[in-house]
């Protein structure tokens, strides 16, 4: 991309998005002023209301799925009935509807060679004090906290010819995370920047060439977006992509749980937590993908660069030595007769300078007179390349024209350190996504999900001995699975403006039975340009 394009992108973000952003920040600041100041990260005694969290959560669930839709219907004009026509795969009932005249702030040109759009996403979260017998350097703070994250993106693209396009996105991310993003395997906000020291200046998010090779003459309709500008594609085709992108753009995609702008926001609800996919701390890698698509199935492969260190911003530019391989098979066939569904099978292998938990534990235990300050350190090793591998299953099934069920399962070998995504070695997630057309609010949607995360035995021992991962480290560990319930309701306010209250309940945060449970309410404001 030329310097002139970068300058134009930055100016557009500043001139168009900035006034709206400042108004939203004012709203968040007013809401925050009604709460007490943020506390320190000390130990909090167990409150007497802990036993009542479960019934309170049940009441909140009932409220969200019964009262909020009715309120939304009263506050806005009813929309037209949902169009559930599909070209391939399941109906994306929880996705933004295709009527772009009301979905975005400004209309998108459907027949143009060019693409220009944008988005701004703000997520405000807080949590009250929760019980914690102790806290460590990488714990979720047990006292009251509040934080607001933001992500703004300018999407641009140009179709070079009938089979090739160039896609370039400029992004800006900032704000803050609860406890700077530490203490949870299933973090409550996927939009947070995991390294608070990164520059707040706009950066290149995506920049790639997309090439399509036709393998059949018949065509299928394609919905234009920032990832593909084509109006139609060959039914049987090979798609190649080269450049900078995020692997979840093309792998482990789920129509119910993959998008923090309209759907869930927990890390392990929107993505497979055990998929330690190649990425820098902002979630992007450099590499290539190959995607073969046929009538009711597809197979894709991706090769991407890995970071230098866990959660690092710099990638290792030696793909013959440090790299990640990803494979996914997709079958577009439902398990319920006459209802559409999809099953996706994922496998991956990473090669990087990763430490081994067992080696760190042995090194720690071999000290003849360990001091209280001595803890195992999985990063204390010479440069070497180790292998990490895992697999995942991604399932979605239409139940009605307005309701879709989803499930994910993931596993990795758990021997090498968690390196690029989060500290999960096994995960299971299930949930429901509903389209607001069910209650005559076509652009609204709602969802509920349950996630259960776990780590391997060596990983448990490492944390119990006081070791620190790049996200977890309470100084000790009374191990238990980290179980999460998440609900949300996204309401369309006007044109491209959406708001979404949400709630997450987390048992055994950071896999520690000596801490929690914790309740995290949230409020999301989203603008589509």
Q: Which residues does each PLM region occupy?
A:
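Outer membrane beta-barrel transmembrane domains
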Residues: 330, 346, 350-385, 406, ...
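N-terminal periplasmic/intermembrane-space "pro-region" immediately following the signal or transit peptide
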Residues: 21-24, 31-32, 65, 70-144, ...
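Short loop/turn motifs that connect adjacent beta-strands in outer-membrane beta-barrel proteins
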Residues: 104-116, 128-129, 158, 162-166, ...
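Residue-level signature of outer-membrane beta-barrel architecture
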Residues: 122, 158-160, 170, 211-213, ...
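Transmembrane beta-barrel strands of outer-membrane/channel proteins
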Residues: 120-126, 168-172, 240-244, 301-305, ...
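Outer-membrane beta-barrel "beta-signal"
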Residues: 205-218, 448, 517-529
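Residues that define the transmembrane beta-barrel architecture of outer-membrane proteins
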Residues: 112, 146-152, 200-205, 282-286, ...
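Surface-exposed coil loops of outer-membrane beta-barrel proteins
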Residues: 182-199, 203-206, 216-324, 328, ...
């Amino acid at each position: 991309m030329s310097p002139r394009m970068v300058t134009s992108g930055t100016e557009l973000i500043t001139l168009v998005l900035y006034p709206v952003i400042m108004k939203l920040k004012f709203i968040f600041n007013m809401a925050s002023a009604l709460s007490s100041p943020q506390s320190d990260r000390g130990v909090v005694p167990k409150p007497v209301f802990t036993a009542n969290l479960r019934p309170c959560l049940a009441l909140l669930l009932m409220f969200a799925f019964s009262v909020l839709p009715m309120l939304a219907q009263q506050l806005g004009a009813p929309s037209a009935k949902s169009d559930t026509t599909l070209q391939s795969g399941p109906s994306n009932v929880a996705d933004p509807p295709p009527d772009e005249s009301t979905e975005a702030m400004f209309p998108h040109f459907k027949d143009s060679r060019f693409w220009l759009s944008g988005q701004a996403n703000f997520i405000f979260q807080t949590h009250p004090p929760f019980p914690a017998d102790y806290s460590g350097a990488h714990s979720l703070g047990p006292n009251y906290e509040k934080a607001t994250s933001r992500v703004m993106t300018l999407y641009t693209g140009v179709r070079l010819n009938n089979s090739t396009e160039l896609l370039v996105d400029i992004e800006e991310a900032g704000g803050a995370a609860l406890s700077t993003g530490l203490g949870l395997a299933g973090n409550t906000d996927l939009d947070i920047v995991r390294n608070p020291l990164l520059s707040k200046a706009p950066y290149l998010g995506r920049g790639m060439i997309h090439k399509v090779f036709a393998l059949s003459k018949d065509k299928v309709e394609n919905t234009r977006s920032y990832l593909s500008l084509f109006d139609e594609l060959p039914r049987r085709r090979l798609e190649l992509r080269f450049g900078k992108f995020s692997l979840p753009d093309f792998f482990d995609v789920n129509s119910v749980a993959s998008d923090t702008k309209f759907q869930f926001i927990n890390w392990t609800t929107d993505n497979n937590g055990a998929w330690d996919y190649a990425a820098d701390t902002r979630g992007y890698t450099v590499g290539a993908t190959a995607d073969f698509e046929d009538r009711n199935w597809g197979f894709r492969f991706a090769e991407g660069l890995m970071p230098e260190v866990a959660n690092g911003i710099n990638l290792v530019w030696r793909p013959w030595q440090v790299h990640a391989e990803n494979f996914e098979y997709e079958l577009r066939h439902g398990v319920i007769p006459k209802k559409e569904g999809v099953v996706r099978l994922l496998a991956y292998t990473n090669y990087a300078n990763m430490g081994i938990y067992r080696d760190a534990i042995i090194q720690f235990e071999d000290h003849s007179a360990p001091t209280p300050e001595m803890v195992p350190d999985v990063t204390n090793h010479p440069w070497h390349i180790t292998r990490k591998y895992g697999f995942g299953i991604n399932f979605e099934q239409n139940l009605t024209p307005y309701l879709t069920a989803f499930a994910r399962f993931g596993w990795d070998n758990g021997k090498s350190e968690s390196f690029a995504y989060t500290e999960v070695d096994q995960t299971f997630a299930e949930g429901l996504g509903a389209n607001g057309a069910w209650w005559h609010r076509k652009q609204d949607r709602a969802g509920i999900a349950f996630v259960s995360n776990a780590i391997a035995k060596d990983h448990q021992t490492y944390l119990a001995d006081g070791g620190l991962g790049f996200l977890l480290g309470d100084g000790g560990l009374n191990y238990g699975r980290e179980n999460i319930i998440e609900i949300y309701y996204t309401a369309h306010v006007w044109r491209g403006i959406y708001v979404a209250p949400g709630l997450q309940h987390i048992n055994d945060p950071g896999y520690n039975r000596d801490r929690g449970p914790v309740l995290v309410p949230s409020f999301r404001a989203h603008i589509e340009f």
